Amino acid sequence: HLMKNDFFFHIGKAIQRLYLDEIFYFACNGKKIEIHTEAGVTTFYGTMQEVVAQVDGKGFWIIHKSYIVNSSYVSIYQYDVVQMTDGTILPISQKYRKLMKSCLTELYRKG
């Protein structure tokens, strides 16, 4: 059976699996999706909608039409950018800034 904490994607005819906990963020580059992990970058053909369908409600935040981040690897949050634990700085688009702020406020209250 499929594991709830895995991300599945196709490379050629093969189905690949990564643990969600290992994924720093997803980046959309045209018709390709880049999966950034500590081990490096894996690329597959797909859409961000396909990514959202698998990671929704599992600790990932949409911060931009081209970026979905694993909240566990966000080290610094600013109004218009996040910095990941690996030092990568990613933009937060205007569309998602209010949502990000409310998510972080909620986390801060719970913490």
Question: Which residues make up each language-model segment?
Answer:
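Inter-domain helical "communication" segments and dimerization helices
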Residues: H1-D6, C103-G111
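Conserved binding/recognition cores within well-folded domains
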Residues: H1-T85, I89
